[in-house]
Amino acid sequence: MPRSLKKGPFIDHHLLQKVDAAVANNERRPIKTWSRRSMIMPQMVGLTIAVHNGRQHVPVLVNENMVGHKLGEFAATRTFKGHVANKKAR
C-alpha cells in the first residue's frame, strides 16, 4: 500500500543533509547510507548512493527513472543460488 499523499515522501533527515552537502560542494564520492526506507528525491539525480544490503554497501547511481522509488529497491538483500538438481531424474 502506498504512502498517503497528504503525508508526503519520507526521507531520513541525516541522508537529506548529506545529499544537500554533496550537491552544494559538487562531490562525486558515494554517499554511504543504511536508510533503505528513504525515497529517492529529484535532488539525488546524478549522485551515487551506497545502500546497505545487510552485508555490504551496494553503489546505486541515481537517474530520473528512479525518482519516487525507495533506495532499498535497488540493493538486493537475498542471493539466489539456484535450485538443487534432482538426482532421481537421471
Swiss-Prot record:
<dbReference type="InterPro" id="IPR023575">
    <property type="entry name" value="Ribosomal_uS19_SF"/>
</dbReference>
<dbReference type="InterPro" id="IPR005732">
    <property type="entry name" value="Ribosomal_uS19_bac-type"/>
</dbReference>
<dbReference type="GO" id="GO:0015935">
    <property type="term" value="C:small ribosomal subunit"/>
</dbReference>
<keyword id="KW-0689">Ribosomal protein</keyword>
<dbReference type="GO" id="GO:0006412">
    <property type="term" value="P:translation"/>
</dbReference>
<dbReference type="InterPro" id="IPR020934">
    <property type="entry name" value="Ribosomal_uS19_CS"/>
</dbReference>
<dbReference type="GO" id="GO:0019843">
    <property type="term" value="F:rRNA binding"/>
</dbReference>
<keyword id="KW-0687">Ribonucleoprotein</keyword>
<dbReference type="GO" id="GO:0005737">
    <property type="term" value="C:cytoplasm"/>
</dbReference>
<comment type="function">
    <text>Protein S19 forms a complex with S13 that binds strongly to the 16S ribosomal RNA.</text>
</comment>
<protein>
    <recommendedName>
        <fullName>Small ribosomal subunit protein uS19</fullName>
    </recommendedName>
</protein>
<dbReference type="GO" id="GO:0000028">
    <property type="term" value="P:ribosomal small subunit assembly"/>
</dbReference>
<dbReference type="Pfam" id="PF00203">
    <property type="entry name" value="Ribosomal_S19"/>
</dbReference>
<dbReference type="InterPro" id="IPR002222">
    <property type="entry name" value="Ribosomal_uS19"/>
</dbReference>
<keyword id="KW-0694">RNA-binding</keyword>
<dbReference type="GO" id="GO:0003735">
    <property type="term" value="F:structural constituent of ribosome"/>
</dbReference>
<keyword id="KW-0699">rRNA-binding</keyword>
<comment type="similarity">
    <text>Belongs to the universal ribosomal protein uS19 family.</text>
</comment>
